[in-house]
C-alpha cells in the first residue's frame, strides 16, 4: 500500500488532524532560506516532532546551507527522518547520511536527468515538480508534472520514490495508479489557506491515496 506524508504542518491542531486521518508521516519544515507560510521555528519543529506518536514518522524538511548545519539541525530536532531540499552535491548528501542516525530523503526535480545520482547515498528520493518563482526550491508549487516519466524514473532506481507536486484529494488516486510510488507527499493540496490545513481534505487525501483498487474494475 502506498504510504502518505502530510507536509508543511505548522500547528499542533493540524498535526493532530494529519495523525488522526491516518498519515504515515508528518512533514515539518524548518530552517529554509525561501519564503514559505509552512515554515516553523526550530523550537516549534521540535515540539511537533515530540508530539508525533509511535508508528508515525516525523520528517524534518530543510534546505541546509551546509551539510554540517543539516547534521546539527537533525541532532537538535531529533526527527525520525530528514528531507533535504536545494542544490546539495551528492557528496554533501552522503555526509549527512553518514553523520545522522535517521534515514535521509533527498528532494529532486522531476525531469532532472541527473537526479538518480543520489540514489546510492540516500534512503529515498522525493520527486517534486520544477520550482516556480513563488515556491523557490522548497516545494509547495501546487503543480503536477509528468507522472509517466516519474514512473519510468522510479523503475530505474532501487531507492524508494516519493511522489510530490500538485497532489490533491481529486487526483491522488490517479497519481498512485500511474506512478505506483512508495509514498505520496501533499502540502498545499490539502490547505484551507497557505500554512493552514483543511482537515476534511487531509482525511479525503489519505483515504483516496490508500484505497485498495477493486480488481473487478481493472
Swiss-Prot record:
Is Amino-acid biosynthesis one of the keywords UniProt gives this record? yes
Question: Which EC number(s) are documented for this chain?
Answer: 5.3.1.24
Q: Which InterPro entries match?
A: Aldolase_TIM, PRAI_dom, RibuloseP-bd_barrel, TrpF_fam
SUPFAM superfamilies to which the protein is assigned, alphabetical: Ribulose-phoshate binding barrel
Superkingdom, according to UniProt? Answer: Archaea
Report the top EC class in one word: isomerase
One annotated GO molecular function: phosphoribosylanthranilate isomerase activity
Query: By its UniProt entry, which Pfam families does this protein fall under?
Result: PRAI
Task: Name the catalysed reactions.
Answer: N-(5-phospho-beta-D-ribosyl)anthranilate = 1-(2-carboxyphenylamino)-1-deoxy-D-ribulose 5-phosphate
Q: Which UniProt keywords apply?
A: Amino-acid biosynthesis, Aromatic amino acid biosynthesis, Isomerase, Tryptophan biosynthesis
Entry's Gene Ontology BP terms: L-tryptophan biosynthetic process
Q: Which Gene3D superfamilies match?
A: Aldolase class I (3.20.20.70)
Q: In which pathway does it act?
A: Amino-acid biosynthesis; L-tryptophan biosynthesis; L-tryptophan from chorismate: step 3/5
Q: Which residues form a coiled coil?
A: none
Q: Which family does it belong to?
A: Belongs to the TrpF family.
Its recorded name reads N-(5'-phosphoribosyl)anthranilate isomerase
Source organism per UniProt: Halobacterium salinarum (strain ATCC 700922 / JCM 11081 / NRC-1) (Halobacterium halobium)
Q: What is the lineage of its organism?
A: Archaea, Methanobacteriati, Methanobacteriota, Stenosarchaea group, Halobacteria
Question: Which gene underlies this protein?
Answer: trpF
